[in-house]
């Protein structure tokens, strides 16, 4: 069995509902604990027992492959009993409300609920109705805190720091919970954040979040240390936000020519799933400057760290 963690960090919050409200110390503590799990996950014995006897329920109202499987793996490696609740076959499909679902689940005494929902604020609402800890695995266009944490860990491991870096977040900022969480985290950690998108894909008043705004890739990528591409979320679009996928790629898709606008040692990220040929081409996505596969690896480590940090606050922990 693997050794106990060296970090004694305890997150001073019962839930992880977003990056908003986390301090620099909170973020740094989670990243430092995550580093231990990166090393653990590269060993033959990947098990710890910090969640032994605990029950983790993954409740996903939106389809997910990466996030749900990452949380499942994280919980099992920490010794938790993990249940994936199928929304498609649940009472929710039969008309049960979110609050009814929360009350029903709470009666089963889960220790940790990992929740993804299509509506912004739904996870926070559910958290008010349960006794255990709740982790937001993405709620509408609001937040996706563990994605921002894994992105920060990936950046820190490859650049040695976050503070002072120029980070360009490019694409469908309007519909992206990943963008919002990353902006909050990166600003807290002292990065210089720039969003790059056509006007139709920028939230009104985005400047108030403390970011620079660029509406073309040449300006947006100039001097960037990190280029973070976002998926074009057509499932959240009701109107014509972009003329066509091919035209979008022509102006805002990342290829080698546009990547050359950034610093020579710039690194490329994408939260996945990728639309190849829409927001990024395969040469860049699979190239030497890409961190996309590493982001997936960091995701398991970060989610293990979050689960452990919250578990330390549970009764009888």
Swiss-Prot record:
Organism lineage: Bacteria, Pseudomonadati, Pseudomonadota, Alphaproteobacteria, Hyphomicrobiales
Name of the protein in question: Aspartate carbamoyltransferase catalytic subunit
One GO term (biological process): 'de novo' UMP biosynthetic process
Subunit structure: Heterododecamer (2C3:3R2) of six catalytic PyrB chains organized as two trimers (C3), and six regulatory PyrI chains organized as three dimers (R2).
The EC number(s) this enzyme carries: 2.1.3.2
Its job: Catalyzes the condensation of carbamoyl phosphate and aspartate to form carbamoyl aspartate and inorganic phosphate, the committed step in the de novo pyrimidine nucleotide biosynthesis pathway.
The protein's annotated pathway: Pyrimidine metabolism; UMP biosynthesis via de novo pathway; (S)-dihydroorotate from bicarbonate: step 2/3
NCBIfam families: asp_carb_tr, PRK00856.1
Residues engaged in binding L-aspartate: 94, 177, 231
Annotated source species: Bradyrhizobium sp. (strain ORS 278)
Pfam families: OTCace, OTCace_N
């Amino acid at each position: 069995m693997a050794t106990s963690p060296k970090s004694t960090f305890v997150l001073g919050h019962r839930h992880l509902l977003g990056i908003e409200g986390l301090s620099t110390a909170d973020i740094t503590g989670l990243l430092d604990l995550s580093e231990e799990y990166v090393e653990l996950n590269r060993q033959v014995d990947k098990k710890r027992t910090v969640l032994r006897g605990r029950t983790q329920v993954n409740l996903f109202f939106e389809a997910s492959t990466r996030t749900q499987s990452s949380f499942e793996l994280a919980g099992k490696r920490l010794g938790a009993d993990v249940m994936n609740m199928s929304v498609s076959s649940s009472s929710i499909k039969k008309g049960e409300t979110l609050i009814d679902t929360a009350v029903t689940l709470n009666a089963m005494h889960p220790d940790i609920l990992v929740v993804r929902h299509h509506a912004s604020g739904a996870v926070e609402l559910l958290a008010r109705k349960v006794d255990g800890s709740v982790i937001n695995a993405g709620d509408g266009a609001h937040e996706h805190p563990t994605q921002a944490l894994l992105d920060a860990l990936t950046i820190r491991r490859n650049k040695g720091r976050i503070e002072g870096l120029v980070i360009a977040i490019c694409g469908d900022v309007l519909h992206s919970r990943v963008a919002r969480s990353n902006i909050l985290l990166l600003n807290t950690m002292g990065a210089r954040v720039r969003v790059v998108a056509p006007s139709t894909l920028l939230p009104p008043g985005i400047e108030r979040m403390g970011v620079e705004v660029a509406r073309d890739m040449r300006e947006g990528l100039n001097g960037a240390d990190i280029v973070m591409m976002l998926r074009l979320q057509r499932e959240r679009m009701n109107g014509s936000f972009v003329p066509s996928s091919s035209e979008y790629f022509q102006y805002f898709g990342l290829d080698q020519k546009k990547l050359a606008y950034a610093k020579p040692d710039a690194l490329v990220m994408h939260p996945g799933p990728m639309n190849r040929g829409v927001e990024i081409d395969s040469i860049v996505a699979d190239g030497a400057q890409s961190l996309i596969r590493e982001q997936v690896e960091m995701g398991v480590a970060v989610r293990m760290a979050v689960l452990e940090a919250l578990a330390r606050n549970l009764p009888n922990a």
